[in-house]
Amino acid sequence: MAFRGRGGDRGGGGRGRGGGGGFRGRGGSRGGGSRGGDRGGSRGRGRGGDRGASRGRGRGSSRGGARGGFGPRPSKFNDARLADKDEDGSEEDDISEDESNVSEEEIEGSEEEDEEGEEEAQSGQPYMSLLKSFQSATKSKKRKLDHTEEEGPNKATKTEDDDDSDDEDDDEEVKEDVDAVDEPEEDPQDAPLEDLFDEDDDLDDSDPFETHFAAPDEATFQARIKAVQANKWRTDRIAQNSNRIYYNTPETGDSTERKLPHSISGVADLKLKKKLAESMAKHTEFDEAEKAVAPLLFNYQDMLYCNRTVASSESIRRMACLHALNHVFKTRDRVIKNNTKLQRDDTLELRDQGFTRPKVLMLLPTRQSCVKMVEMICEVASPEQQEHRKRFDEGYVDKSTKFSDDKPEDFRDLFSGSDDDMFRLGMKFTRKTIKYFSQFYNSDIIFASPLGLRMAIGSEEEKKKLDYDFLSSIELVIVDQADALLMQNWEHVEFIFEHLNLQPRDAHGCDFSRVRPWYLDDQAKYFRQTVIFSAFNTPELAELQRLHCHNWAGKARLHPEYPGVIQYLGVKTRQTFSRFDAGSIAADPDARFAYFTKAIVPTLVKRAKDAAGTLIFIPSYLDFVRVRNYFANNPDVASVTFGNISEYADTPEASRARSHFLTGRHRVLLYTERAHHFRRYAIKGVKRVIFTKSEQSLMLEHGLGTVKVMFSKYDIMKLERIVGTKRAGKMITEQGDTFDFV
C-alpha cells in the first residue's frame, strides 16, 4: 500500500532565507545567480514562527535542509534502532544486503525520486530548499572554482578593481540580484495628461470605487469604523449554492447594511474602465467560481475564499487581476485629471491619493505563480509595450519539465516552473506600457513572496534600516494560494500585515494637500480591502482575517459544505478515528502526545513483530521531534525499530529510511507533513497509517491496510474535509470517542 496525501492544516512556522539586517545569511549557487542586492546579498535563514520551532520548507536536501529561524541547523539525529544490526559490518554493507532482497521493480520508484531530487539540486532553483550542510556547501563552492579554472581562456581579463572578487568567500557571497532596481523615486502625482487610460469616463456615483474610496459618505464610514474599533460585528450565515458564507458587518444598528452585494453574472454587471471592458468583451459570462467571488471582490469587501482548486485557479486570477487593474486605472486617471485642473486653478482642494503610489499588493508563493499572475494582467490590460519583459522572462520563467505525470495535479501546479520563493517585483502602468522592475515607490502593483518582501523591508534588529513606507497606501491586498504560504514561514505574512497602512516615516515627495483625509487620520487600514484565496480554511487564515481585516464595508468567509474525501477513496480500507479530550488549544499538544503514548504505542509494542509497515504521519515538527525522541530514548519501545523522514532529511537520508522501511528493517517510519508537502514521496511497504492529527485529505493506493486518526475538538476544520461537514459535527459532540469507517 502506497501513501499519498496533501498537506492540510499547517504545523507551523516556515522556513526563511536571511538577507539584510540581522538575518543570518548563507551563500550558495542558484543556477546562475542568487538573491543579493538590497536584500543583503546572501541567502540564509529567515525568522521562524513559534509554531514549529521556526521551521521551514523541506523538499529534501536538493531543496535545502534547514528551517527558517536563527541559529545553526540542528545536529543530525542518530535516528533508528536497527533490527539485526551487524556490529562488524558497515552501515553501507547492511543496506546492500537488505536491498539485495528487494526486487528492482519495488525500489524503482524510490530511485527515480532520488534522481529527481539530485537533478533539482543541480538545477539551482528550489521552491524553499532546505539549507545544505556546511560540508556540502564547501563542495559546491569547490566545484564552482574548478569550473572557473577550466574556462581559462574564456574568462574576461581581470583588472585591479576585481581583486576582491577572487576571494573564495566573496565568490559565494556576492551574487547578482535579478530583482534589484536602481532608479530614483518619482513624485506620486507626476504624470502627463497623455497617460490617461480613458479620457472620457464619466463619474458614476454608484461605482463602488466612488462610494468606498473616492467619495464615501463620512457619516456612514465613521459610524462603521467606530463599531470596528469596538470589535462589534454582526455575523450572518448565508447558504449560497454549495457554499457557506459567513458575512460580517460592523454593528451600527442599521439592518439594511447586512445584505450581501447583488449577484454578478458577467462583465456587464461591473463598473469597469472602458479599456478593461473592451478587453474583457469576449469573456461576457462568468463561471461558478467567478460568480462566487465577484460580488464581494468588486464591492471592496474583505474576503476569505476557501474553495480554490487547480481547475478554478485561472478564473480566480482573472477576477483578481481585473479588479486590481480597475482600481489602479481609476486611481491614476483621477490623479492625472486633477493635475490638469490644478494647472488651471491652483486654489482647488482636490484630495485624490495616499502617501505613496503603490496601491495593490499581491502575495504569492513562487516565481511561477507570479508569472501566471503577470500573464493574466497582460491578457486583461492588453498593453502596447512591455518594458523590461525580457529581463522578467529570464528571471522568472522556467520552461523545463521537472515532474512526471504521476505526481498529483496540485503538486505540479504549485511547483512546476520556477519554484523559488524569494522574489519581489514592482510594476508600473501608463496608458500604453507596462514597466517591470519599477522602483517600489514608483510602482502601482507590487508582486512578492512573503520572504522576498520581508527581506526588502529589512530586519527588526536594525530598525534604522527598516523601510515599509511603500506599504503605507496599499488599498488592495490579494493573497493567492494561501494554503501554500502556510507551508512556508507564516510569520513573514503576519509581519507584512503588521506593517501595512502605517504612517510613513519620510515624505517621499508627497503633496499632503492632496492626501485623502482618512489617510491623514490614520484610518487607511479601515478602507483597505484584503482578499485571501485558499484551497481550505485553517486556524491561521481565520486568525489573519480576524486580526488584520478591518474593512468598514464588511468581510466574509466562503467555504463549501464538504461531503468528505473519505467516500472517494480508490480503495476500501478500515479507518478508525479516535477522539481525545484537550482542555484548551494550549493544552492540545500535551494531551495529544499523552494519548499517543498511552493508547497507540502500547499496541505497537505488544505486536512488535507485526508492527512492520507502520507509517506515523506527524504534521507539526515540534511533535515530530517529541515522538522521535520518545522512540529513541524510552525503554518501553526498545523493541520497535524505526526510521524518520522530516523536512531536514537530505536525499540519501530519505532514500535510506524508505529502503529500510520497505525491507522491514525499520518497522515504523516517522514522516512529517512538510516533508510530504515538498517531496510527495510514494512510500512503499505501508500496511497501516497512524495520523497523530487529522489531515486535509488522504489517498491510499495499491493494496489494503488500516488507518488510525487521532483528533480533538480543535481539529474540526481538518476533520470536516475528510469525513464531511455533517459527520464531523457529530464526531465532535457525540459521547463515543471511536468512529470506524470501512
From Swiss-Prot:
Comp. bias regions, Polar residues: 122-138
Keywords: Nucleus, Ribonucleoprotein, Ribosome biogenesis, rRNA processing
GO biological process: maturation of SSU-rRNA from tricistronic rRNA transcript (SSU-rRNA, 5.8S rRNA, LSU-rRNA)
Biased composition (Gly residues): 10-35, 61-71
Keyword Nucleus recorded: yes
Pfam family for this entry, one: Utp25_C
GO cellular component: nucleolus; small-subunit processome
Biased composition (Basic and acidic residues): 36-53, 146-159
Subcellular location: Nucleus, Nucleolus
Function in brief: DEAD-box RNA helicase-like protein required for pre-18S rRNA processing, specifically at sites A0, A1, and A2.
PANTHER family: ORF PROTEIN-RELATED, U3 SMALL NUCLEOLAR RNA-ASSOCIATED PROTEIN 25 HOMOLOG
Protein name: U3 small nucleolar RNA-associated protein 25
